Amino acid sequence: MSRIGNKVIVLPAGVELANNDNVVTVKGPKGELTREFSKDIEIRVEGTEVTLHRPNDSKEMKTIHGTTRALLNNMVVGVSEGFKKELEMRGVGYRAQLQGSKLVLAVGKSHPDEVEAPEGITFELPNPTTIVVSGISKEVVGQTAAYVRSLRSPEPYKGKGIRYIGEFVRRKEGKTGK
């Protein structure tokens, strides 16, 4: 039994949910998100509560049920509160700059890396070594942050690179000399 799928989604004040043949549009103070869901799952909107129902208890239906509920809840949270991921840069001379909506990273290469912000994503730099990726879509925020991190992943010997704030990087011992 999918416990996540059975939870009720409560719509906060200022958030509207429209279901048109399982193409769900969620509007809120931060923006609007639209996504198409499986036609097997029935989405019911009753006032400020949204419930999801599946036709049977097969394994496939249980997985789709829980996933649909989680994606729908992420849409509601995104348009009401938004999502953000914070990254930090460690290394001598590693720094970031903003040029319009473009993020320019100096991460020890012969050239600076430039990252164009996808639609709906904003970059913020509280200081030159901290990057905040924010937006209303949890999926796009996570993908963008993962791409920025992949430009210089933390290496295990000195720990240099771009990492999520709070991420543990396993360190290795170097070679021992004679």
Curated annotation (Swiss-Prot):
Gene3D superfamilies per record: Ribosomal protein L6, alpha-beta domain
Keywords (A to Z) from UniProt: Ribonucleoprotein, Ribosomal protein, RNA-binding, rRNA-binding
Keyword check for rRNA-binding: yes
GO molecular function annotation: rRNA binding; structural constituent of ribosome
One Pfam family per UniProt: Ribosomal_L6
Alphabetical GO biological process terms: cytoplasmic translation
Domain of life (superkingdom): Bacteria
Keyword set includes Transmembrane: no
GO cellular component terms given for this protein: cytosolic large ribosomal subunit
NCBIfam families noted in UniProt: L6_bact (TIGR03654)
Family of this protein: Belongs to the universal ribosomal protein uL6 family.
Quaternary structure and interacting proteins, as annotated: Part of the 50S ribosomal subunit.
Function text: This protein binds to the 23S rRNA, and is important in its secondary structure. It is located near the subunit interface in the base of the L7/L12 stalk, and near the tRNA binding site of the peptidyltransferase center.
Name of the protein in question: Large ribosomal subunit protein uL6
